[in-house]
Amino acid sequence: LKNFLDKFKFEYSFKSSSILYKSGFFNDTLKLILENYEGIMNIIIPTLGKERQKTYSPFLPICPDTGVVLEIPVSELDTKNSKIIFDNNGKKLEQSILDGNCKLQWKVDWAMRWYALDVDFEMYGKDLIESAILSTKIIKLLGKSNPSGFAYELFLDEKGEKISKSKGN
């Protein structure tokens, strides 16, 4: 990728989302997402199965004891203090969403990155078109325009097989 970008004299920088979460770079956008929680839920929930609808939250808290990302429902919101409240193994926890104490579910995370990084253009495989549509609705709810998009066919490896992260090809 770098060779391609350099060849055509693109200006670019690579950013680690983990570092951006932990450094507080995403904090203002995370607060905005918390303030728009219900609207985001109204966008995402209809796209989920009945069981997943019961437990879904855009926020995935990081366990304060283990550092593991918890895929558990959020029971309460504290928008004033930028906190979420959730039950972890029978223990009610209140935790900040800021400074790397949470991550976001994929489609909300994508919209957050577009928003916080002022993304102008986004390429994605045709398998992500539905995700791009939902992320577009979310960024518009947050008050910004979505980036111009370009959907491409999936890439094939030298054997003509679909490139897959899980296969490692």
Which role does the model predict for each range below?
Residues 36-39, 46-169:
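Alpha-helical recognition segments enriched in aromatics with Gly/Pro capping
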